[in-house]
Amino acid sequence: MSPTGADPAVLPKYEHLYLHVPFCARRCSYCDFAIAVRREVPWRSFADCVSRECETRRVREQSALLRTVYLGGGTPSRLGAEGVRATLEALRSHVQWANDAEVTLEANPEDISVDAVIAWREAGVNRLSIGVQSFDDDVLSWMHRVHDAASAVRAVEAARMGGIAAFSLDLIFATPERLARDWEHDLRQLIALAPDHVSLYGLTVEPQTPLGRWHARGEEAEAPEERYEREFLSAHSQLVGAGFEHYEVSNFARPGRRARHNSAYWRGVPYLGLGPSAHGFDGATRRWNIEAFAGWQRAVEADRDPVDGQEGLTPANRTAEMVYLGLRTVDGLVIEAEETERVSAWERAGWGEVIQRDGQTRLVCTAEGWMRLDALAADLTAFRSPS
């Protein structure tokens, strides 16, 4: 029997693995993620703890040949060349991945050099997710980012020169009005760098962050809803015009370059989550690890499963997730005949389109519909699960 009492014969066979690397040089003003600010990153002990978590949780028995591996954070690039190599070797001692697996490393511009990229590539990384966030130095300073705009451009050049041509760039939009940010300039700069993938995130105010405290004291204000929508739709228009597919509410890709790891999340398939605060899903139950690095480390060094909680999906949960995840992507949500009339008002408003694909009727949100995703998903979920 497994530590959780499950029959090993029916353990899930994961094809996707997420590892949370919590280390950061400093906390960004908007960030409420589980991070550990460290001047010196304890990469040896981290890699050892990753291996011990794999052993305690019997990851080898639960894993098929992995299709994607994602090192997220935090700032995984803070591990450095040796740390990334040691961490991937720790994983490989317990799991295997396919020759064509997507292996992504989240990286900040200040950590990216040609030598670092070469080392990461030789360790097995074949895709980078680069946290640019803005090309405006004043905005970057306000965000408490370590890099500036020039170093972001140099990082992209280094990625290509180091041999990792597959990379995604992140930008944050809807920053406060008083920063007078030129969003159109950021988009032009982004497109000029010719990434094969882009992720855009609207700024949100989280209570336990510097931004949250500024907001509570009345020192900072959220961007108006109108500007949030205007910047999102402008990004949609410009990126689609530049040849990107807007394939998920926050993500754009060149043809054939969708993020395979995150796409697995949106399809609702099982994935393994390792590291402090990491979430995982076995197809029926969601679980999450101890959030703090020190607490996670103590648990795995004592050969304990570092689980902090878990939740089985109820039929109502499954319905809500199916609707929400389906509406997030251009693949859309399969709908039944009795639902077409329900969503006809969405079509008339320009928020969605009912299409036929692979013999199925699907509802696909437009960019304008994605701006109302929560409300539309709640409406359709309520229709499918009447109280």
What residue spans do the PLM features occupy?
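Short basic/hydrophobic patches in alpha-helices and adjacent helix-turn junctions
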Residues: L325-T329, A345, G352
